[in-house]
Regions:
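Bacterial N-terminal signal peptides
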Residues: 10-18
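Bacterial N-terminal signal peptides that target proteins for export
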Residues: 2-10
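Bacterial signal peptide processing site
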Residues: 25-27
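C-terminal motif of bacterial Sec signal peptides marking the signal peptidase cleavage site
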Residues: 20-23
């Protein structure tokens, strides 16, 4: 197992990546909005193509996209998970899920599978010693579809906004365009390897960095545009019936003040516009951010059991989305 003991240094690095990335860039003030507007960012769009899969021979695979910021990246602490669950369960997560593969690029190549498709285990998070929602997703999906291959394409940018970074002026922004190249690169690889690969759902865990009053006021319109771009640009890879958008609400952490209620209300309102938009409240689900590390909690990220539960919830709604297609 690759996971090592957690050190305060790694935790600080992860926290800085996820919550302070935008604050570390040069900015200019905008008199019109009252916002401190970040300078444009440049993304690395070099996505390698190692040949890591056998010929698919027409095998049908469900493809799920996992997008967002640090709680999608994976900053829940593996060591605490080990202490909070049965040893046999932890061993199962550590050994991984051979039928659920992941290809990931996190924080502009800060952590990456280097274009390879790996089985999901506890080593696919922001850094060594952290895990993300893909673990809970794989747990649920491997049980629901024991005879099928599931593929997760995970692309995240910790600490960055929908308003300025995934989008820019309501149009496709730097992160979006880099993500799109990532998705197209590996969907084309799967198809070229003779897999019948189709995207059935997008799981979105984002919004914590949009909780100023100005950005929150624009979140509904931004998300409407964002999902429209996703469905249009990925339409050639879409599952029969289209692509579901499964949206997790953000926490009520102090880091999400003042406008976490407005962000979550925007997400909920968006979900009501189509049966293919699904929203769930992480607050109502009881997910927590205040317990770990013990004595000095990382208020920005889900505690270990909550990080696992976040993935379970995503997995359950993915299953619901396929059930609605009659599968």
């Amino acid at each position: 197992m690759k996971t090592k003991n957690i050190t305060s240094t790694i935790l600080i690095i992860c926290l800085c990546i996820s919550m302070c990335a935008v604050s570390c860039t040069d900015r200019t003030n905008s008199e019109e909005t009252g916002e401190i507007v970040p300078d444009p960012i440049t993304m690395n769009t070099d996505f390698p193509l190692p040949d890591s899969l056998p010929d698919g021979e027409g095998e049908r695979v469900k493809v799920i996209l996992l997008l967002g910021q640090s709680n999608a990246t994976g900053c829940s602490i593996t060591e605490y998970l080990k202490n909070n669950i049965e040893a046999s369960e932890f061993e199962r997560y550590s050994n991984g899920f051979p039928s659920v593969l992941i290809n990931y690029c996190l924080d502009d190549h800060n952590a990456t599978s280097n274009g390879e498709f790996w089985k999901v285990d506890l080593t696919c998070g922001a850094a060594n010693g952290f895990f993300g929602p893909e673990v809970g997703m794989a747990d649920v999906l491997s049980s629901a579809y024991p005879d099928e291959k599931i593929i997760i394409l995970k692309y995240t940018m910790s600490g960055y906004t929908l308003h300025y970074h995934w989008l820019s002026g309501g149009e496709r922004g730097a992160i979006y365009n880099a993500f799109l190249k990532f998705a197209e690169t590996y969907m084309n690889y799967l198809i070229g390897k003779n897999y019948d690969a189709k995207i059935g759902a997008i799981c979105w865990m984002q919004g914590e960095s949009d909780t100023t009053e100005f950005k929150a006021a624009h979140y509904y319109d931004n998300q409407t545009a964002f999902v429209s771009y996703l469905r249009s640009d990925l339409s050639k890879y879409a599952e029969n019936g289209g692509i579901y958008f499964i949206d997790a609400g953000i926490s009520n952490s102090p880091y999400c003040e003042p406008s976490y209620p407005e962000i979550n209300e925007a997400k909920k309102l968006f979900s009501e516009q189509s049966p293919m938009n699904i929203y769930f409240s992480t607050i109502d689900a009881g997910l927590t951010v205040h317990k770990e590390p013990e004595g000095d909690p990382d208020w920005g990220h889900y505690d270990s059991l909550s990080g696992l539960k976040l993935g379970h919830l995503f997995g359950q709604y993915i299953i619901q989305s396929y059930d609605s297609r009659g599968e």
